[in-house]
């Protein structure tokens, strides 16, 4: 039996495909390549010595989904596909709702028709909005989202919650993760944003390699220890392992299951700059600029439920995150376009 990974050519998706192939799973990838590259899957093959079957296309394409379910014996879906930039979502809300919400609805409907009942959803800490309690536990209030990206994730969570109640065959696992960083230690796959990066670590590493002149630090007047935003940064390989653990724990385990995937530690933007400089012996030029719309001051997790129920704990620390980020960037200065 195979696992369908939507968005499997993307940053988190490709790292998860590596973990699945490494434990002998058969993997089918669907990706429209709007913010990813097919080269990532070639690199996955280099790392694992195994190949994922690839379909280029969109989760909104019912006919293609029907073809995939007909041609492959799929028993589980891990759903990464979607648009993911907070700032862009404020400018393009309808695109985000169409891709992230309508796309997931189509996928769930076609899974049901095909009799595929195991679903792992790539959600986000943004569903917590501006959190009232830190660290954030899974039972903290959701829905007070501050941008359309977060709202789209929250809406999908509600759809999954209602679907799990209405259709008892479904095993729905929601993984709310915090800020993925780093890259595979081989340096073969990593985060490869189009244009100016929206995420911090690619931005820092592109300054380090000389691709960008300096880092823009969005907001220096937050109520944090140094005025810059505090986040829970998690190594992408730890995150990928979390998906595998969730799949193994809840395969054919009907109902709704929700977990935070994070380290439980918060670091500011300037903490991250200093950590990168220290780990890689490089100076990063930066400037303090205005806050970015939709951003909040502080967000980090309590990941103890995942430890208790999934046996999952983030193992890779800040230094490893920085070293692996730089190893990927210096070996691939233009990302997958090299």
Curated annotation (Swiss-Prot):
Residues bound to substrate: 124, 149, 179, 199-200, 216-218, 231, 292-295
Gene name as annotated: galE
Amino acids binding NAD(+): 11-12, 31-36, 58-59, 80-84, 99, 124, 149, 153, 178
UniProt keyword terms in alphabetical order: Carbohydrate metabolism, Galactose metabolism, Isomerase, NAD
InterPro entries: Epimerase_deHydtase (IPR001509), NAD(P)-bd_dom_sf (IPR036291), UDP_G4E (IPR005886)
GO cellular component terms given for this protein: cytosol
Name of the protein: UDP-glucose 4-epimerase
Record-level GO BP terms: galactose metabolic process; monosaccharide metabolic process
Family: Belongs to the NAD(P)-dependent epimerase/dehydratase family.
Reaction it catalyzes: UDP-alpha-D-glucose = UDP-alpha-D-galactose
Cofactors named for this entry: NAD(+)
Record's function text: Involved in the metabolism of galactose. Catalyzes the conversion of UDP-galactose (UDP-Gal) to UDP-glucose (UDP-Glc) through a mechanism involving the transient reduction of NAD. By controlling the internal galactose concentration, it may be linked to the biosynthesis of lipopolysaccharide surface molecules, which are important for the pathogenesis of H.influenzae.
